[in-house]
Design a protein with these regions (language model features):
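Nucleotide-activated donor-binding/catalytic signature segment of Leloir-type glycosyltransferases, i.e.
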Residues: 247-271
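Conserved donor-binding/catalytic core segment of Leloir-type glycosyltransferases
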Residues: 4, 201-226, 238
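Membrane-proximal helix-turn-helix segments that form the acceptor-binding/catalytic region
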Residues: 79-83, 102, 106-109, 134-155
Length: 390
């Protein structure tokens, strides 16, 4: 089995982690995998950020021109993809969906090679929500065309799968494959106590968050919650990562007199993230879009952390309230704060939820190897069915 993996990622964050882990897992199963993507060099800086020239384009070009440039890049991507097909001779094309990126569909229709499409988000909807879309009609058209043109579509949640069906994708073409973890990355980690001690947090109760913090994560609410607690309360917010709202959060903490209760590690290499996050007593999953499958959620499970997550459908696909997580209403005033109060006050509950989250990960096999097996199986089926026509 020969798989040509096509993507348009130019950042070193959870997206590239997904690509690297899936490719490694596929190769470990036997398929030969070739990757084709943008010609950019990205250092292993951890979470967040875009390659320099991409970031500059986003900042300097007006929105309409940037989106036209995205659409225009699909022609470049198509030529690269066709060249890779000629050189590599794949049995299938595996593409990570990106907005304004129909190159995989074009190549598949031109060559007869089946296309497997991984979908992490309906990006036209996502960018429209945050006012980052100017050519909505064009984006919607590209998106529907790409989704409907794939032979197999792999959404990361059933919520997203249902959205694809509403866009016209045939149910029989959809296979839900959530994110996962590489168990080897979570071997030989320090204990929670040791991880705290290494970071000067030995006497703290750590509420933790992994990621590139943005405004919609609403960590300002957590800072306010910390400030409202007694002065000698040990609760502390630790962010393993960085983000554009870090200066505002740090200024808020200083203004409230709790600067010592807010800890940012800054950007760290991805392979070092688990060792830092082992300091968490409570792992916070912030309110995201209802179709996402956040990588950090599975990382929290692998570390056996007490998870506090928003009560929304995509999380119910993975977690069970009171068994392997606690949940809060992301829309209710005081929703996350009241559940944090309960978890801080109940060490036994934190222990039970942490054990439950680790067991759930094991029982349901949220690992890259399992995901790769499902992709390889679909690839084999499609390659066999298309062979006579090629």
């Amino acid at each position: 089995m020969r798989i040509l993996y096509h993507h348009r990622i130019a950042s070193k964050d959870g997206q590239i982690t997904h690509i690297e882990e899936m490719v490694d897992a596929l190769r470990a199963l036997g398929p030969v995998v070739e990757i084709v993507g943008p010609d950019v060099h990205i250092a292993d800086t951890g979470q967040g950020g875009s390659a320099g020239w991409v970031g500059r384009l986003k900042k300097t070009l007006p929105g309409v021109l940037y989106e036209l440039a995205e659409a225009g890049y699909s022609l470049v991507a198509y030529r690269r993809l066709r060249a890779a097909i000629r050189a590599f001779g794949p049995d299938v094309i595996y593409e990570r969906y990106a907005l304004y990126q129909p190159a995989g569909v074009w190549a598949s229709r031109r060559t007869g090679i089946p296309l497997l499409l991984e979908v992490n988000a309906p990006y036209a909807l996502a960018r429209r929500k945050y006012n980052q879309l100017r050519l909505g009609w064009l984006a919607d058209s590209f998106e529907r065309y790409t989704f409907r043109g794939a032979d197999r579509v792999f959404p990361v949640t059933q919520v997203l799968g249902d959205m694809l069906v509403a866009m016209g994708v045939q149910v029989g073409r959809i296979r839900v494959i959530p994110n996962g973890i590489n168990p080897k990355a979570f071997e030989a980690l320090p204990s929670t106590e040791a991880a705290k001690a290494c970071r000067g947090l030995a006497d703290r109760l750590v509420v933790g968050f992994i990621g590139f913090v943005r405004e919609w994560d609403q960590l300002d609410r957590i800072v306010d919650w910390l400030a409202a607690r007694p002065a000698r309360d040990p609760a502390t917010l630790m962010v393993v990562g960085d983000g554009p709202v870090r200066p505002a959060l740090e200024a808020q903490a200083r203004r409230l007199g709790i600067a010592h209760k807010l800890v940012f590690t800054g950007v760290v290499p991805r392979h070092e993230v688990p060792a830092h996050a082992m300091a968490f007593d409570i792992a916070l999953q912030t309110a995201l879009v209802p179709y996402a499958s956040p990588l950090c959620l599975f990382e929290y499970m692998a570390m056996g952390k007490a998870i506090l997550a928003p009560d929304q459908p995509n999380h119910h696909e993975v977690l069970r309230r009171g068994i392997d997580c606690d949940m809060y209403d992301p829309h209710a005033p005081g929703g996350v704060e009241s559940r944090l109060d309960a978890l801080v006050a109940d060490a036994a509950l934190r222990g039970r939820l942490g054990q439950g989250s680790r067991q759930a990960l094991t029982d349901r096999a949220y690992v890259w190897e399992g995901n790769a097996r499902r992709v390889a199986q679909a690839a084999t089926e499609l390659a066999r069915s298309s062979a006579p026509a090629r």
